[in-house]
């Protein structure tokens, strides 16, 4: 079931109920997704190089919140990340903003999201350089998600961390010897302190009801590929796949999701306009970078990463350019 069709059907009810809550970046997203593969989005004239047959193809919208677009970009990102994988154990650390501060994130999205990235990455790097933990500079790939599996507003940062780091003083690689990275309760305590200090310095007014205990989840993630695939799902394609939209009946949209605690598939039904708000509230500010690399995985540290790969005897293959899918001619099958 296409999100564009749902947007067309419930557009008026959505605008009537949520227009006062829309942010400036929501409007271009609504416009782009509404025009997906319609004459308003334009068309491409395609000509077969074999028989010369021509036909028109409707264009996609290209918006990163559209579940139909950016498949190629998602694949390219995952290819680039796989080229950086090391033969070590990987870990997935998740830093979550507590419920009491989510209104602050909604009203100051760029600022708070940047603080989430900065405080989460700094916390992990400081734990890594601590001799009691690893005593080395670590690397990580961090991704911002603003939703939980029920699509509610739930800002958090995932960080995929290789189990090892670079000891710059000794010029050697130090490997994490167990399937345990850092103590998640200690991570949460330090992250809380740093975020609150940074938010105060940035001029944000904190509520009196800030919880004393925050949640950081840190777990083993195998060889890293499964965690990267999980994170890649929502980089360029919105927060819900259209195959998860189950039905559109009697003015209600039903979608399915996998419950995190039980891993069982559940369904949730809402009015059409409420479903649209649930999805569109996760549109990020224009130009905001949802994914960021740190440490020896940063784009400016390619030389260091290559040295690490050399030490770990990683076979570096020449990067092959993945081509976009080609059109098949209906006349000559070329």
Each predicted region: which residue ranges?
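Beta->alpha loop/short-helix hinge microenvironment recognizer with preference
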Residues: 1-334
